[in-house]
Amino acid sequence: VRIARAVGYPVIIKASGGGGGRGMRVVHTEAALLSAVTLTRGEAQAAFGNPTVYMEKFLTTPRHIEIQVLADEHKNAVWLGERDCSMQRRHQKIIEEAPAPGIPPRLLTRIGDRCAEASRKIGYRGAGTFEFLYQDDEFYFIEMNTRVQVEHPVTEATNGIDIVQQQIRIAAGQKLAFRQRDIVRKGHAIECRINAEDPYTFVPSPGRITSYHAPGGPGIRVDSHVYQNYVVPPYYDSMVGKVIAYGDTRNQAIARMRIALSEMVVEGIRTNI
């Protein structure tokens, strides 16, 4: 209660061991705080086996911005650019893009350089992502994801660096083959996650895919494990694929994405296409 008063309402209670948008609860009044903590602890224990929770200031109109980094064991670290992952449902990302529109370059350079420096100081090795909430020209650190993320292709598309390949080379003890000044970004990329779920209620839609056709064309990339007659199980995340569109401009990337989604066929189950 004392911490919430100092931070100021609204606050958000988060599960320490959580992820994927689960184990979070927003609290607007002091009267609701203790029950929210209790409920979130119970949810965290059931979902993650860890009842530990923590509290943050809740931002009312933030954007979800993240910085991609690569670091090797030789104290070299670079940041590859930012991604805007603000389009979400149930605190889970649905549409991601790079670069993030409308954020002053000086602010992005400052936060990107800090992320690279932090990676060096903690001795980080591999691919990683620093996640932030962004509001009123300020970045608020959320967490660092120490892995390759679903949305990494939009960064690859705009700077030409294969993040998975670099991660393997780093794991083999190799030095990064480039420095910060060598990284040049070009164009715009957007990713849409394709989920097996009702597009209106978000209820999962497992079952057999009776027909499947992936889109193609200039600037289009599709990452998916499914095929015709594949059975989507009910036990895991509902994502069955992702479509990435690249263009010289944001408008071109959006236009290509719209065409790609109109061409994509996934029948037998419901999807968010």
Placement of each model-derived feature along the sequence:
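Gly/Ser/Thr-enriched, mixed-charge loops and adjacent short helices
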Residues: 1-6
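N-terminal cofactor/phosphate-binding cores enriched in small/glycine residues
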Residues: 12
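ATP-dependent carboxylate activation and anion-phosphoryl transfer catalytic cores
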Residues: 7, 15, 20, 27-273
